[in-house]
């Protein structure tokens, strides 16, 4: 298995640490707030979210989803959001780059398509962190078994799209 990230992974991982470590200071189901800017999403709430594949928290500054797939997904392109995935369970084939086939705009700055033509296929599995910058088409083409992963969405300026690189695990 390989671990992939972009050239600006340090800033994206910093965003992930800030989002998860400095507190999720908004109101959502299964959270407790201590009044000091720290929010805890309980284990029960997290497990329930993963059972259905639903968001844990969504704010204007970031979103954290408990993502679940049992089969292939839809190709996506986000004009503004960086996606950071952390795979908890399962494995999948992730296609990035290329051209979305029969793409449709589904929301402002969001495009969906049934597939991607000409992209790069990569195997991802438990423990992998994947950072996909805004503007990069991506698609979970094949999913083996239950595929559970955290998704952290960090909005950024559309001009912040960066190239990617690969880091192999030791």
Please give the residue ranges for each predicted region:
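N-terminal secretory signal peptides that target proteins for export/translocation
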Residues: 1-9
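Bacterial N-terminal signal peptides
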Residues: 11-25
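A short, N-terminal "cap"/entry segment at the start of jelly-roll beta-barrel domains
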Residues: 22-80, 162-170
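His/acidic/aromatic-lined binding-pocket segments of jelly-roll/cupin-type domains
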Residues: 76, 83-86, 121-122, 130
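Short, conserved beta-strand element in jelly-roll/cupin
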Residues: 79-100, 106-115
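Conserved metal-binding segment of the jelly-roll/cupin
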Residues: 123-143
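A short hydrophobic beta-strand segment most commonly corresponding to one strand
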Residues: 145-163
